[in-house]
Amino acid sequence: MATVMAATAAERAVLEEEFRWLLHDEVHAVLKQLQDILKEASLRFTLPGSGTEGPAKQENFILGSCGTDQVKGVLTLQGDALSQADVNLKMPRNNQLLHFAFREDKQWKLQQIQDARNHVSQAIYLLTSRDQSYQFKTGAEVLKLMDAVMLQLTRARNRLTTPATLTLPEIAASGLTRMFAPALPSDLLVNVYINLNKLCLTVYQLHALQPNSTKNFRPAGGAVLHSPGAMFEWGSQRLEVSHVHKVECVIPWLNDALVYFTVSLQLCQQLKDKISVFSSYWSYRPF
């Protein structure tokens, strides 16, 4: 019995020593690794023109789709803003070519990119608030920090992977419709959003429903992408979507950022798992 108790005490001492090493050394090593990865992610969002200061450089992306050639164009991205859009639309019925572009004095902020960048900055702030000289006293303290960092990273990722669901009146009321010169025809709506690593542009063609129409008017709810036949009321008119054209372009640095988010979340979870393993060795929570 004495031998068993001695062995148990020895094992406990070893475990306690390992846990102290984890708190004092490995935790800080992981925090440093996370900081380095997230700083790389942050750089992807800023894309400075020279050095680390100055305006973000402009990048041109050609819009394309494997399903249609009705819409062609080029989008110019400058950091978190769309600084130019040059779009050609071939009308399905008469093959008339419409051209519209941003007014020179206008830029369209992509809120998804801005929000994702802010969440990354908040995660970095949380990590740097515990520098190398800081001594973690309990595992619970580490778990709390990891949970807070993971929350910011999950929010950053979700902003890029989950576009907002908008109603057609919300799209019609958006300032984006007033960005173009010449002004968009009244039977067109345009929406721009991020989906994963892609910048997507959707053009909706509309037609007015006659007051004596026998169609059962049912306003469409919110959606990322509305389908032909979706109806809505705008002003005194009832309108229906007749055609939908979606084109997109891949933004390579958004793909990089998503990879960094995934790797960082995995590192956080691995550290949480290591901390939690020690709780299984004691009937009480020593951390």
Curated annotation (Swiss-Prot):
| Gene Ontology annotations for the cellular component aspect, listed alphabetically | axon; dendrite; hippocampal mossy fiber to CA3 synapse; nuclear envelope; perikaryon; RAVE complex; synaptic vesicle
InterPro entries, sorted: RAVE2/Rogdi (IPR028241)
Residues annotated as signal peptide: none
Q: In which tissues is it expressed?
A: Widely expressed with highest levels in spinal cord, brain, heart and bone marrow. Also expressed in fetal brain and liver.
Its predominant location is: nucleus
Localization annotation = Nucleus envelope; Presynapse; Cell projection, Axon; Perikaryon
- Positions carrying N-acetylalanine: A2
Keyword Acetylation among record annotations: yes
Q: Specify the superkingdom.
A: Eukaryota
Q: What is the effect of changing F261A?
A: Decreased protein stability
Q: Any idea which UniProt keywords this protein has? A: Acetylation, Amelogenesis imperfecta, Cell projection, Cytoplasmic vesicle, Epilepsy, Nucleus, Synapse
The Gene Ontology biological process annotation of the record reads: bone mineralization; brain development; enamel mineralization; gene expression; hemopoiesis; locomotion; locomotor rhythm; memory
Family to which the UniProt record says this protein belongs: Belongs to the rogdi family.
State the associated disorder.
Answer: Kohlschuetter-Toenz syndrome: An autosomal recessive disorder characterized by severe global developmental delay, early-onset intractable seizures, spasticity, and amelogenesis imperfecta affecting both primary and secondary teeth and causing yellow or brown discoloration of the teeth. Although the phenotype is consistent, there is variability. Intellectual disability is related to the severity of seizures, and the disorder can thus be considered an epileptic encephalopathy. Some infants show normal development until seizure onset, whereas others are delayed from birth.
Assembly mode: Monomer.
Name listed for the protein in its UniProt record: Protein rogdi homolog
Originating organism: Homo sapiens
- Gene name, please? ROGDI
